[in-house]
Structures are given as structure tokens and as C-alpha cells.
């Protein structure tokens, strides 16, 4: 039986709009871990399998919002690969800005320092944050609500056999490696490489309270959900200028984002948590995904799906599995949910972006593997040359 919300959504359907820039999901394979859908999802875009210097990658995006707020990219070069997942909120402006600028900042800083490092990642995040706040300053007179637009930002780089990850927000990078379980070495094990900067976690709430001891409303339980200042769940982001600088405060005509008291210090941070790992022979792949995926499945469930299925289309498979789970929560199946158009579909699941980077260990030893130097943007047919060539040449 459909829930009342599902019935309402299906009753209110308008004709589905199509996009020239989006690949229609035409997969008819009914082996999708419980997804027995018989036709494609017009809001699901993917690239099945591409090469990078150290293996393959697969990327998929599904739209739920009226205007998609997730942006993403994969940059491949001879001897390096870059992944970015940018989960926007309040609008697409911040995530789009990150997609257009962060990688260029990273290449500029890395070229100046002759290496890709944790410090280079931090500098790229800082430059991106300052650039977006400058954009907000220029445009907030005409568009005040741009001050309430922000984005989570998750990036990963593999270079010289090392994986570097930087993150603000609650997107995740999860490693799949062959570990031991009861003396068996053939079990895939999930290891979360990032921290969730989300007020749902007690340690995040404690951190905020310690940083703001004079503010009894720094975190508020609202309708069963912990929110910072009663407004937002993530504690770190790019953007969200109104929670960082008093000059961007919003007046009472925007009650959702109006703060009763002027900011004394930034409430949110754009400082990333950075992680470095020298890749081991047991490391098989990394899943980079926005929180729309992790709302529907655990880290271990995700790595097991990747491990037991063929590489081509694996990111799409993860997205479809997440949508199937979301549909079941509303007493629907995937075929029903595919009839729900963008905007209304946000009641059922978030925009979801998934990138799976496979690691072929023998290629880590190759100085410069010959692969196409490509720049691929999620949810877009546009493919161009990567700026990695500037740094790596």
C-alpha cells in the first residue's frame, strides 16, 4: 500500500521533463540488490566506467531537488586522479562555484609548491571559501538569500601512491579493503576515511558547545533533529555566509535564516579535516558520495555491493539501490518512484552523487600510466581536457 505522501505525490504528477545534458538510465538489468525495475530513471545520470592512472572509476548522479544542488567532478591525468563531490544546500550556487574553482586553486597552489599535499588542499579550500564569500558580497544586495547558500565539500587525490582526502560537511569517503575476519582474509572491510561534520553526532555538539560556551542555543533539538542555531545540521561548509560574518546577516523578512542576536564569532567553519594514506595492496577501492547515499545504507553495505558486482555501472548500481531503499520506506517500489518528478521527489530522497575509484595496485608502481587526461563533470555531457596536465607536465 502506498503511504499518503506517496499517493499525494503520484496524484499531483506533471509530465516528466527531460534534459538534453542528462543521460537517461536505460539499464534493464533486474539484478540490482532488490531493485527489479524494468525501465530507466530519467533523473539518473551516469558514466559506466572510465580509466584513471591507477585503475577505473564509475560515477552516477540522481536528481531529487527542483534544481539539482549536487555538483561533482573527476579529473584524470598521467600519474594522478582528483575526485570532488559538492553537496549544496539552500541552492546550487555554492556547489557550482566549488566545481568551477576549487580544482584550479589546488593546481595553482600545488604548482607553486611542486607537490600535492595536505597544506595545498587546505589552501585550496581557503581560496575557494574566500572567493565564494566575495561573490556573495557582490550579489547579496540584489539576491540576499545567496548569503544562506552553502555546500559540503569532499575531495580526494591519488598521487605518487598516496591518497589525500579533505572534507567539510557530511559527505563521506569510504575505503574498501581486504581485511581479516576470524582468520579469513577474503572479506571486504569498510573504513570511513572522513568525519561527519553534522550536529546529529554528540562529538560535534560537544565541539560546538566548547567553542561557544556563552551561547546556550548553539545547538538546538528541533522536531527531533539537532540543528546549529536551530537552522542547519552541518557544522562545516563552504558558504553559509550569514553564519560566519555579521555583514551577511539576514533581516527578519527572512525568518528562516534570521538570527535573534548578532554573531560574535563564526558559527560554521570552512576548515577541512584532511587525511593522508599511503595505499596498501589490500586497498581495493574508495567510494566518494554525498550524504544522500549514506542516509540509505551503511558503509559496509556499500562496499559489499561494490565488491560483489562487476565494475561497469557500479556507481549507478549504488544509486539505484539507495533509491530502492528510499522507496520501500514509503511503501513504494522503484518503478513507482521513477514516476515522481524532480522537486516532489525530494520528499523521498536527496540528490545523490556517487564516485567509485578502483585501485589496481600494480599500476601504483607505474611512474606515469598513459590514460586520457579528462575533466568529467557530474550530471553533464561536457568532457574536456583536465588541468592536471598543467601541474604534471
Swiss-Prot record:
Residues 56-359 form the PPM-type phosphatase domain. Mn(2+) 1 binds at residues 87-88. PROSITE patterns: PPM_1, PPM_2. Mn(2+) 2 binds at residues 87, 291, 350. Pfam families: PP2C. Gene3D superfamilies: PPM-type phosphatase domain. It catalyses: O-phospho-L-seryl-[protein] + H2O = L-seryl-[protein] + phosphate; O-phospho-L-threonyl-[protein] + H2O = L-threonyl-[protein] + phosphate. The keyword Iron does not apply. InterPro entries: PP2C, PP2C_BS, PPM-type-like_dom_sf, PPM-type_phosphatase-like_dom. It comes from the Eukaryota. Its cofactor is Mg(2+); Mn(2+). SUPFAM superfamilies: PP2C-like. Signal peptide: none annotated. Binds 2 magnesium or manganese ions per subunit. The keyword Hydrolase applies. GO terms for molecular function: metal ion binding; protein serine/threonine phosphatase activity. Disruption phenotype: Plants missing PP2C42/PP2C-D2, PP2C64/PP2C-D5, PP2C79/PP2C-D7, PP2C63/PP2C-D8 and PP2C68/PP2C-D9 exhibit an increased hypocotyl length, as well as an enhanced sensitivity to LiCl and media acidification. Its EC number is 3.1.3.16. Keywords: Hydrolase, Magnesium, Manganese, Metal-binding, Protein phosphatase. PANTHER family: PROTEIN PHOSPHATASE (PTHR47992). Belongs to the PP2C family. May dephosphorylate and repress plasma membrane H(+)-ATPases (PM H(+)-ATPases, e.g. AHA1 and AHA2), thus influencing negatively plant growth and fitness. This is Probable protein phosphatase 2C 68. It comes from Arabidopsis thaliana.
Amino acid at each position: 500500500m502506498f503511504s499518503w505522501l506517496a499517493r499525494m505525490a503520484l496524484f499531483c504528477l506533471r509530465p516528466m521533463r527531460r534534459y538534453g545534458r542528462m543521460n537517461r538510465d536505460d539499464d534493464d538489468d533486474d539484478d540490482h540488490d532488490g531493485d527489479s525495475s524494468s525501465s530507466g530513471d530519467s533523473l539518473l545520470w551516469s558514466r559506466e566506467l572510465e580509466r584513471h592512472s591507477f585503475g577505473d572509476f564509475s560515477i552516477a548522479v540522481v536528481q531529487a531537488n527542483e534544481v539539482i544542488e549536487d555538483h561533482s567532478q573527476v579529473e584524470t591525468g598521467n600519474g594522478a586522479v582528483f575526485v570532488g563531490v559538492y553537496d549544496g544546500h539552500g541552492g546550487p550556487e555554492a556547489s557550482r562555484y566549488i566545481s568551477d574553482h576549487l580544482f584550479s586553486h589546488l593546481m595553482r597552489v600545488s604548482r607553486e609548491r611542486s607537490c600535492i599535499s595536505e597544506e595545498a588542499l587546505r589552501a585550496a579550500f581557503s581560496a575557494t571559501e574566500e572567493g565564494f564569500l566575495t561573490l556573495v558580497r557582490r550579489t547579496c544586495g540584489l539576491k540576499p538569500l545567496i548569503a544562506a547558500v552553502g555546500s559540503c565539500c569532499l575531495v580526494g587525490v591519488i598521487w605518487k601512491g598516496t591518497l589525500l582526502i579533505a572534507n567539510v560537511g557530511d559527505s563521506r569517503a569510504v575505503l574498501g579493503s581486504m581485511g581479516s575476519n576470524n582468520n579469513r582474509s577474503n572479506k571486504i572491510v569498510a573504513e570511513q576515511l572522513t568525519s561527519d561534520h553534522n550536529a546529529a553526532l554528540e562529538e560535534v555538539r560537544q565541539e560546538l558547545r566548547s567553542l561557544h560556551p556563552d551561547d546556550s542555543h548553539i545547538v538546538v533539538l528541533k522536531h527531533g533533529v539537532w540543528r546549529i542555531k536551530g537552522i542547519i545540521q552541518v557544522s562545516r561548509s563552504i558558504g553559509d555566509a550569514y553564519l560566519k560574518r555579521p555583514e551577511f546577516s539576514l533581516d527578519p523578512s527572512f525568518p528562516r535564516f534570521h538570527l535573534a542576536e548578532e554573531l560574535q564569532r563564526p558559527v560554521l567553519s570552512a576548515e577541512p579535516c584532511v587525511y593522508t594514506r599511503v595505499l596498501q595492496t589490500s586497498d581495493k577501492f574508495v567510494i566518494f558520495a554525498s550524504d544522500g547515499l549514506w542516509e540509505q545504507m551503511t558503509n559496509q553495505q556499500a562496499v559489499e555491493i561494490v565488491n560483489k558486482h562487476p565494475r561497469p555501472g557500479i556507481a549507478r548500481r549504488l544509486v539505484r539501490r539507495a533509491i530502492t531503499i528510499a522507496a520501500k520506506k514509503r511503501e513504494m517500489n522503484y518503478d513507482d518512484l521513477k514516476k515522481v518528478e524532480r522537486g516532489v521527489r525530494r520528499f523521498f530522497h536527496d540528490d545523490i552523487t556517487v564516485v567509485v575509484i578502483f585501485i589496481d595496485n600494480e599500476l601504483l608502481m607505474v611512474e606515469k600510466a598513459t590514460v586520457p587526461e579528462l575533466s568529467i563533470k557530474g550530471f553533464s555531457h561536457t568532457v574536456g581536457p583536465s588541468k592536471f596536465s598543467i601541474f604534471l607536465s
